[in-house]
Structures are given as structure tokens and as C-alpha cells.
Amino acid sequence: MQELINRAKELLADGTVARVLGWKAGDLPYNPEPAYFETEESLKDFVYNGFCGANLSKYMIEASKLEGKTLVCLKPCDTYSFNQLIKEHRVDREKAYIIGVGCKGKLDIERIRKQGIKGIESISGAEITDEAETLTIQTIYGEKTCAYKDAMLERCHVCKGKEHKIYDELIGESKDTKDADRFAEVEKIEAMSPEEKFAFFQSQLSKCIRCNACRNVCPACSCRKCVFDSNKFDSAQKANVDSFEEKMFHIIRAFHVAGRCTDCGECSRVCPQGIPLHLFNRKFKIGRAH
């Protein structure tokens, strides 16, 4: 991480970039958040570790409107999203200085919790340069351990590859983390009867609280005016009156991003209800392939 910080300082100092788009520590040790850094001094708060799962491509839509270049840190999977945004003329390539950062798979705190690990105070082994295959977790109940691969986000188990598709320079090495078939879960759903499919999606979508996190984080949801914010009909409201509205929001959103979704998995990562929203988009992908 220090190499990345040093390079960012150099690019700020010589005027190549006006700001850096990366991550800073959040309120919890496993919750870093996207952040801008405009001075060398501010980079003391920069972090990059296994919990930096956020895809920063979408932030470049607004950054492209600012004066000067923005240094943006992109993981291999993020570069697919950035390329798609270039095709749609939503980001300005000339306003971006892309550093392709190494990735050994990003971590999902919920997968750690599902192993019965609670009361987390700190986690070691998540550093990007750390080759450790085990996370050491300090909790209020004592020290716990967890295999790194068992704590990875679902999208990392079906990784599209460790190569960056667009960059100005690379810092850090990436690891091939794929150990599962990308469409296995979709094929399981495809094998269900119509009644079983309906029951599956009904059970998942009934958990939705319409927080709009999936839409807000999605690089493919880049319309200047979203249909769901329209005041001409009731879709702008947060609460769902009935199950039809629950389905309408997600099905329409899936149709809107069909053919442009890069399967970055951000929708599922940020969902506070744990809904596997990426399965909708993968269903469209497998349908197009057939």
C-alpha cells in the first residue's frame, strides 16, 4: 500500500492529477469507504486492503466533470465497468489517471459472521501485500481465525481474471481466485419449476426495503434522471405497498442494465438485506448466451 501512496503523492506534487480517488478507513475496521484526497498530507488517511471492495468506476462520472485529472484506483474487475462507462460516454478518459491496483480477492464481513465470529475489534491478514491465507480476528470474546478464501465475496470466487483491461500504470500483483462456475447458481434456478422460481424470488425480494443502495452503487445505473425518482407516478416512494412493487423495482432495473452490466457484484455487496441481486443480471447474461 505504501508504494501506492508514494506514487499518488508524486502525481499530486507534479500536477499530473488534481485529486486521488481511493479509500479511507471507515467507522469499523472492515468498512473502508470511497474518498477523495486532494493533498499529499490527506493521503495519510488512505487505505487499501482486502475490505476495499467498492468499485470506484461510478464515482468517475462526477469526477469527470471536475477540473483536472483524477487518479482513480481500479481493481481488475472494476476496469470492465470503467470501459463500459467510456463506451456510453459517461466518463471522460482524458480526465482519469488509472492506477490498476493488485487484488487477491475482496472480503465479505457477512461471510465471517456466518462462521460464528462476532464482536470484531480488528482483523489482520487482509493487507494487500500479505500472503497469509488465514485471517486473524481479534474479538471481544478472544482471538479467532478464518481462512481468507472462506471470507471472500461471491464475485471473487467466480473472478473474471486478474488482468486489468485499462490502466495508465499498475501497482501490485493480482491473484487468480476463481474456484467456482459463474453461472452455477443461475442454472440451479433454471432447473426449478415455475412455482419454485416464483417462490425463490418472492422470498428474496420480500426482504427489500427500497433503500436504493443497489441502484446508487451500480455503474450501469448512470441515467441523469432515474425513472424511479419520477414524481409522475408512485415508484419514487420508498416503501412498497404490495409485493408487485417489490418485484417491479428490481425487474425493471435488471432490464435497464441488461447488456451493459459487467457483473461487478456491487448490487449484492451493498444490499443491507443480503439479497443476491446479481442473479437477476446473470440470468440475462446466460439468456443472451443461449
Residue locations for each model-derived region?
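Iron-sulfur-associated redox domains of electron-transfer enzymes in respiratory
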Residues: 1-201
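Active-site-adjacent beta-strand anchor residues
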Residues: 72-75, 208, 270
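Hydrophobic, aromatic-lined core segments that form the binding pocket/scaffold
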Residues: 151, 210, 215-217, 221
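Short Cys/His-rich metal-coordination motifs, predominantly Zn2+-binding knuckles/fingers
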Residues: 159, 211, 264
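A generic structural-conservation signal
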Residues: 21, 95, 217-218, 270
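A generic "binding-loop/recognition-motif" signal
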Residues: 78, 214, 267
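Residue-level marker for well-ordered alpha-helical positions
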Residues: 5-6, 202, 212, 255
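Ferredoxin-type iron-sulfur electron-transfer modules in oxidoreductases and energy-metabolism complexes
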Residues: 178-206, 220-288
